[in-house]
């Protein structure tokens, strides 16, 4: 049995051009000498007032970044609608798209929380990252989205062979950055430091 894994690894500098040149510097919440966070607990993302409700139809022209398909019909993407970014889903091979959760990012108000890429770890585990200090994830196909905020910048997120989400977070320790590996066994609600190869 062979397992294929796709990984996007993007530098913080490259993200600036991907998301329109508006990257914000991370907010330092721990000193470099304190070391990486041991655990990160996500918070539930609630729908901001004035934003689209989950299940709202959005045009394919509003999609930015990548699209991820888990089969011939079902896929996920990020859309920019007005001043907000949303996760979106299709069940007809990309002919129509609907929002698949609350607004993940409000452009002006949440610059450090931007997302630029979307990925899927199966039918239910969907995650977005890149451009800020967060990984937004849903363990249940979009019914609930959770935000994990890291002290560094997530540069890659993938699903390991055990079905767990694995994130590589840039520690931003100067010219020579070191990525720290975190694992979530519950679809993005809780992350823990894990330096084993591929995550346990």
Q: What do the predicted segments below correspond to?
A:
Residues 1-10:
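N-terminal export and membrane-targeting signals
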Residues 81-84, 172-175:
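Short glycine/acidic-enriched loop and turn motifs that connect beta-strands
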Residues 55-82:
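Beta-strand-rich domains and repeat architectures in extracellular enzymes and scaffolds
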């Amino acid at each position: 049995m062979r397992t294929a894994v796709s990984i996007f690894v993007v530098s913080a500098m490259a993200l600036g051009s991907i998301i329109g040149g508006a990257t914000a510097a991370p907010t330092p919440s721990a000193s470099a000498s304190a070391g990486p966070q041991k655990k990160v607990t996500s918070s539930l993302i609630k729908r901001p007032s004035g934003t689209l409700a989950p299940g709202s139809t959005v045009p394919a022209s509003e999609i930015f970044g990548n699209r991820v398909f888990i089969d011939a019909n079902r896929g996920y993407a990020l859309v920019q609608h007005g001043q907000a970014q949303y996760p979106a889903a299709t069940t007809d091979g990309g002919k129509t798209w609907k929002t698949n959760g609350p607004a993940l990012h409000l452009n002006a108000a949440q610059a450090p929380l931007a997302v630029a890429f979307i990925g899927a770890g199966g039918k239910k585990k969907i995650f977005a990252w890149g451009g800020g200090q967060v990984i937004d994830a849903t363990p249940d196909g979009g019914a609930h989205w959770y935000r994990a905020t890291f002290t560094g910048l997530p540069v890659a997120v993938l699903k390991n062979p055990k079905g767990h989400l694995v994130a590589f977070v840039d520690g931003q320790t100067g010219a020579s950055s070191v990525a720290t590996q975190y694992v979530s066994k519950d679809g993005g609600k809780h992350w823990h430091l894990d330096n084993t190869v591929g995550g346990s």
